[in-house]
A protein has these predicted regions:
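Aspartyl protease active-site motif detector
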Residues: 1-36, 65-70, 76-77
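Sterically constrained small-residue positions within well-ordered secondary structures
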Residues: 6, 27, 43-45, 57, ...
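Basic, gly/Ser/Thr/Pro-rich low-complexity segments located predominantly at protein N termini
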Residues: 14-15, 46, 53, 82
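Generic recognition of well-structured, leucine-rich alpha-helical segments
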Residues: 22, 27, 39, 82-88
């Protein structure tokens, strides 16, 4: 299980290298040499992106592209979520992400002043649920 911090100031959803399984592929920003700026002003290089399939505590199967960079923990961009058709609601003790088309919702936990989304990420080494026909 991976915990991502919901970040209303993040342009992209970003994670440190090695947190998510899968091949890091070049992204628009990594190819253009663009990166990020940390809160203390230091520059952070964009290393590419990983498409992350995951399940939520509610059993929803989701997929989000994460940019890979030397950040401390996975950050989930509110801007990216809302651009993808979701509404993010943050309350005093918790929050939710609601898909405006399907109505599906994902619970967020508020801990230490930040909102956390729990992601159950499949192991890259796990066998696929269906074998290829003729294999």
């Amino acid at each position: 299980m991976v915990e991502a911090v919901v970040d209303s100031g993040a342009v992209h959803s970003v994670a440190p290298p090695g947190v998510f399984p899968g091949r890091v592929r070049p992204s628009l920003w990594s190819r253009a040499g663009r990166g990020y700026r940390a809160a203390n002003g230091t520059s952070i290089k964009n290393l590419g992106e990983v498409d992350v399939p995951f399940a939520t505590a509610e059993g929803h199967r989701c997929r989000i592209p994460f940019q890979i960079a030397s950040v401390e923990q996975p950050l989930l961009s509110v801007s990216h979520l809302t651009s993808a058709g979701n509404m993010v609601q943050l309350r005093d003790t918790d929050g939710t992400i609601v898909n405006t088309t399907t109505g599906r919702s994902i619970a967020l936990e508020r801990r230490g002043g930040v909102y956390i989304m729990k992601m159950w990420v499949p192991d890259a080494a796990a066998p696929l649920p269906f074998g290829r026909q003729g294999a």
